Every structure is written in structure tokens, then in C-alpha cells.
């Protein structure tokens, strides 16, 4: 875990800290963070889609995930991977981006040492990175991924998947084939002790255009049940 001096530009007196800078493995990482002051509040990291295809932490699906975790009582961080926005470095084919995400988790844990749980979330490329991080960090309690690119990247590393989670997919996704995601969800679901909630959003394309509210509803509903906060 990183020491507290790895975090820069932090104002601890405020609950809302929209801009943070983290010392990453390739230089500074730009992020946005909202802190929940409740003792033991869970923490979450949200990861964006492919850096070479316009993916940033301000992507609408990423922002929807971020706000859904915040609304569910999480202290939540989203970052720009290396070479995106004001984050330093350059695209590293997933390897460096995985290290960026690991550093962001270290930052979250350093700033929230009493957190009751930690979750990972991601959209598209960010889902692939997030699931790899899930395998490397046994402390993760759960995951939420949207449009995991199972037709583009190898997900066989999830053998076994260490945590239950939520997978959301549009049935009109022109980038990620729904059938490939359904197959991935089914494969993970067969593993002992896991519960994978696979939800299809009818009519949704890859970017869930005009359907972010539906994504948010699925996420907040799932988190309420998973964290025991449902009424």
C-alpha cells in the first residue's frame, strides 16, 4: 500500500473533492473523487473505456457508474489512465493501465483505512482491466462491469473468479457482442459459491445512449442488496 504522501492536491476538510492527483507508475494520474464521511463507508474505483478510442473518466457510462456508487454510500474514485487528459505517460496495451488502477486502489485504501469493503467497476476496456485487478487483489468484495469486451479480450484468467458481481450489457451493442458477454456470465456463474447477476438492457447500444438512467437503476438496486442496505 502506498504511503499517504503519494496523494497530492487533497483538501481533507471537504466531503466533495472533485479533483485529485495521484503519483502513478508513469507519472501523475488525474482523478475525480467523492468522499463519504460515514465511518467505515465502502470504497470503489471506476475505470474508463479504451484510451485510444476516446475513452476518458468523463465518459457518460463511467460517470453514471461513479454517481451510482456515490449515491449508494461509497467513497468513489475515477481516474484517467496514463496518457489520457492530464494523466502523464502513454498507452501501454493494458499492462500499464492495470498498474495505474492498482495504484489508484492503493490511494483509496490509504485515504480510507477504515473502509468496510472495496469494489471495482468498469466500462468496456475498463471492465477488462477491472476484472484483472479483481484477480490480483483478494480484498475486493464485488464488481460491477458494463459491456465487458469478451469478444475482443481473453477473460479466461477468471478461473476461478474470486467474487460475485453485476454484469450489464446492451442487446444492440455494435462493439461488444451480447452473445459473448452472455457466455462469459454463464461461465462465471457455474463456479462454486458465486452469484453473477447478468442484466440485459433492451435496445441499448455500446454507449447506452439515452439509457444511462436504466444503468444507474440496475447498479443502485444491485448495490443496495449486495451491501445489505435494501429496505
Summary of predicted features, one role per range:
Residues 37-78:
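Short, surface-exposed "cap/lid" segments of acyl-processing enzymes
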Residues 122-130:
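Gly/Ala-rich beta-loop-alpha elbow adjacent to hydrolase catalytic centers
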Residues 161, 166-169, 173:
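Short beta-strand/loop motif that positions the catalytic acidic residue
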Residues 171-176, 206-207:
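Acidic catalytic loop of the alpha/beta-hydrolase fold
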Residues 188-207:
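Catalytic histidine neighborhood in serine/cysteine hydrolases
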Amino acid at each position: 500500500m502506498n504511503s499517504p504522501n503519494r496523494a497530492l492536491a487533497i483538501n481533507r476538510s471537504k466531503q466533495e473533492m472533485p479533483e485529485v492527483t495521484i503519483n502513478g507508475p508513469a507519472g501523475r494520474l488525474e482523478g475525480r473523487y467523492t468522499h463519504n464521511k460515514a465511518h467505515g463507508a465502502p470504497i470503489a474505483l471506476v475505470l474508463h473505456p479504451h484510451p485510444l478510442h476516446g475513452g476518458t473518466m468523463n465518459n457518460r457510462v463511467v460517470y453514471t457508474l461513479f454517481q451510482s456508487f456515490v449515491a449508494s454510500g461509497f467513497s468513489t474514485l475515477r481516474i484517467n489512465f496514463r496518457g489520457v487528459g492530464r494523466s502523464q505517460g502513454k498507452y501501454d496495451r493494458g499492462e500499464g493501465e492495470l498498474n495505474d488502477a492498482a495504484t489508484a486502489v492503493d490511494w483509496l485504501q490509504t485515504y480510507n483505512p477504515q473502509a468496510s469493503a472495496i469494489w471495482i467497476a468498469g466500462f468496456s476496456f475498463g471492465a477488462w482491466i477491472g476484472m484483472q485487478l479483481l484477480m490480483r487483489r483478494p480484498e475486493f468484495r464485488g464488481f460491477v462491469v458494463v459491456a465487458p469486451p469478451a469478444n475482443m479480450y481473453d477473460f479466461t484468467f477468471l478461473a476461478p473468479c474470486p467474487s460475485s458481481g453485476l454484469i450489464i450489457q446492451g442487446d444492440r451493442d455494435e462493439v461488444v457482442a451480447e452473445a459473448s458477454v452472455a457466455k462469459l456470465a454463464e461461465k462465471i456463474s457455474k463456479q462454486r459459491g458465486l452469484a453473477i447477476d447478468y442484466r440485459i438492457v433492451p435496445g441499448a447500444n455500446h454507449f447506452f445512449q439515452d439509457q444511462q438512467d436504466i444503468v444507474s437503476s440496475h447498479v443502485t438496486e444491485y448495490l443496495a442488496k449486495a451491501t445489505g442496505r435494501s429496505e
